[in-house]
Amino acid sequence: MKDKMSVFAETVLRQKYAQDGETWADVAHRVVKTVYKSVSAPKSLVEQTTQYVIERKFIPGGRYLYATGRPYHQVNNCLLMRAEDSREGWADHLQKCSMGLMTGAGIGTDYSSIRSEGKLIRKTGGFATGPCALMQILNEAGRFIMQGGSRRSALWAGLKWSHSDIQKFIHMKDWIPEVRALKARDFNFPATMDGTNISVQLDDDFFTAFNKEDSLAEQVYWSTVERGLKTGEPWFTVDCGKNKHETLRNACTELTSADDSDICNIGSIHLARITDLEEMKSVLGCAIPFLLAGTVYSDVPYAKVDTIRTKNRRLGLGLMGIHEWLLVHGKKYGVDADLDKYLEIYATSTDVAKQFAKEWDLSAPVKTRAIAPTGTIGIIGETTTGIEPIFCAAYKRRYLKGHIWNYQYVLDPTAKRLIEREGVNPEDIEDAYVLAEDVERRLAFQAHVQKYVDHSISSTINLPQWGSELNNKDTVQKFGKTLMKYLPHLRGVTAYPDGARDGQPLTPVSWKTAVKHVGEVFVESMDICELKGGSSCGS
């Protein structure tokens, strides 16, 4: 496969990750050589890993590409936090989150332990303001703290389904028409929780209650589904069985933990560039030790993070290019026996990690696999992101250059290859909008892949706009029943109706329009903020 990058991939590389005019090969050498020095890796491993990165068969997470070699090198991504229910706990949480954001981490917080709004505070005689208040304080901090001084802060908030304030939480983003209009004109206009992704947390008790037709469980479920179908949030995270204590998540929700101040550490294998099963084993055998070395190399924002990282040493090796792999092999998006052979090798990462941890005298990682949404590294890899289908054959993508928002017309690289090499009609490519008519296929596939993943999968189901034929008040029950069929087998689910938020980063356009303008860069008429349509973790 040719290694020459497209103009758009080169633009993203140059503006987000390259240091001092580096080429992609330069970035690969800088990142791999520097990270492996922390564990005295053998020369053969360094050279082979570097070659796989150059060939884009394995791409480390965005923090590795950006921060490796800098004086402060926090290459592990998001912090996974738990907010404690006390004045000291609130202050400590805000301080740690600020430290994390300023050094490059996204923040995911479980707020379920905070007492509900209106509860009596015995020491002062006052009343609690509840978890939603603390979420909003952190949301406003994130508005003014550029993550690592270079990008918009990434935040996630979760609240348990049985919390007394759950309905307030579910409706936090029900912005009044006046606010929506102002944000349509200027997306920097502040609105409640506009910089935070939110999820309702489900557990074994929820599913037991729902199956017994418990009124609270049903009310929470259906109100969440309807809000999600209308506005894109909130949706669900799922923590059941052996994972029941892992309620903490990173900002994109694919990493999970039970321990406050845990940290995620991600990179992805580009499945569509892997030639066969033997090469899959070889790439895996380089990706895992690289991420393991990253747990030694990376700086952290405060001491507890290092303590928890040493205890858990979580790795988040993901996959991307799954839909491209299926397309190249003439297969439809969905469960496939040949794909499973690659997933089975992927699942051996636990044993590979234990082997290298023993060789390097490190604690063995408690878990090793998490499929991130691979936003910008998916662009660099020029493939389909995570487990996502092709978004669409051609689209307009907005991105930040300094403090100014630009956009370019993009020909999806997978679609482009199929159209140019195989003569496929652009209108015949099965994309996210086609699959919006078959939500069950999307959910069934995610549930199947989850069997091979010990953390979680961050994936967004694209849906038609609320009020359209396939997404309206009459389709809520059908969607909700289909979702419930698969929800116990997932670790989380997200869906996004087209146009739910003004200023969304990806907008479908015609193939003809994109071809006409490809390679051109346009400047937005106003400075507006990017929503999550790829990895807010820079993965």
For each feature predicted by the language model, list its residue ranges.
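Conserved, charged catalytic cores of large soluble enzymes
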Residues: 1-47, 123-137, 147-245, 319-354
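Acidic/polar, glycine-rich intrinsically disordered N-terminal extensions of enzymes
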Residues: 1-75, 81, 481, 488, ...
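Catalytic alpha/beta core of large soluble enzyme barrels
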Residues: 4, 248-260, 267, 291-296, ...
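Function-dense linear segments that define catalytic or interfacial modules
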Residues: 14, 19, 34-41, 50-123, ...
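A glycine-rich phosphate-binding loop feature that marks nucleotide/adenosyl-phosphate handling sites
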Residues: 52, 66, 111-117, 157-166, ...
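Extended active-site and interfacial segments that coordinate phosphate-rich ligands
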Residues: 91-99, 115, 127-139, 173-189, ...
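A structural-propensity feature for long, helix-poor, extended segments
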Residues: 116-155, 274-299, 403-446, 454
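Internal maturation/activation junctions in enzymes
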Residues: 286-306, 310, 321, 326-374, ...
